[in-house]
């Protein structure tokens, strides 16, 4: 792959990632009790949970999360998160992203006042079609399967940091379960204790996974 193609692929991925993040990746949320899994394909669009003014945050800054992750998983090192410039001047959030490879990015929604994480995300962006040498369908399918496996591995690693009592195998099963149940859905969520897991499957445009804190009510405690 030539330099021009790599540059185009990088610009394409960065642009699409920015669009997906600024378009409120999880803009569809059905009404569901906190103890139930839920998915929506034709629900009314509402404000994503982490965008609400009273949305809780993890007691963790981006730097602290990255240090903890890289120490725990030195073979899956996350590069520094870079701030994403958006037109949301009055937004209470700061968005930042870290490139993992050509198709996978990690991003965060940071509370601007507290500087702690509201939403921690992984986004898989399929590479744009090659203009120079079209790939065979079977090669594309093979590459996509491998890319999705990497996504699932990072999902499992993220989950394990917030569920330290769970084995990595259990977290891997959880990641695969989320991807399967959220397949084809613009919003799929599972709430477990103080955590919300979200899958936003945009089909050929990519998949975003998020892990977010939940503010428990008195009845939940």
Question: Language-model segments: which ranges?
Answer:
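Bacterial N-terminal signal peptides that target proteins for export
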Residues: 2-13
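Intrinsic-disorder-associated interaction segments
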Residues: 10, 40, 51-58, 62, ...
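Bacterial N-terminal signal peptides
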Residues: 13-22
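Sec/Tat signal peptide C-region and signal peptidase I cleavage site
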Residues: 23-27
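N-terminal leader/targeting segments
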Residues: 28-131
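A cross-family detector of function-defining hotspots
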Residues: 73-110, 162-202
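Long, charged/polar, surface-exposed segments that mediate recognition or autoinhibition
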Residues: 109-180
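Short, low-complexity, Pro/Ser/Thr/Gly-rich segments in the mature regions of secreted, periplasmic
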Residues: 204-221
């Amino acid at each position: 792959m030539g330099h021009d193609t790599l540059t185009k692929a990088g610009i394409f991925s960065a642009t699409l990632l920015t669009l997906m993040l600024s378009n409120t990746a999880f803009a569809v949320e059905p009404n569901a009790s906190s103890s139930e899994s839920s998915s929506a394909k034709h629900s009314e669009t509402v404000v994503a949970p982490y965008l609400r003014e009273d949305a809780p945050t993890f007691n963790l800054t981006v730097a602290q999360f990255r240090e903890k992750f890289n120490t725990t998983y030195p073979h899956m090192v996350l590069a520094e998160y870079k701030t994403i410039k958006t037109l949301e001047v009055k937004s209470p959030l700061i968005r930042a992203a870290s490139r993992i490879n050509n198709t996978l990015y990690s991003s965060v929604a940071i509370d601007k006042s507290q500087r702690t994480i509201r939403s921690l995300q992984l986004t898989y962006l399929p590479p744009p079609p090659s203009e120079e040498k079209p790939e065979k369908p079977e090669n594309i399918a093979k590459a996509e399967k491998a890319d999705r496996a990497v996504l699932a591995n990072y999902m499992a690693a993220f989950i394990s940091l917030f569920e330290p009592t769970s084995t990595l195998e259990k977290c891997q099963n959880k990641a695969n379960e989320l991807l399967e149940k959220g397949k084809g859905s613009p919003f799929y969520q599972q709430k477990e204790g103080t955590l919300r897991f979200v899958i936003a499957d945009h089909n050929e445009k990519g998949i975003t996974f998020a892990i977010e804190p939940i503010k428990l009510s008195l009845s939940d405690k």
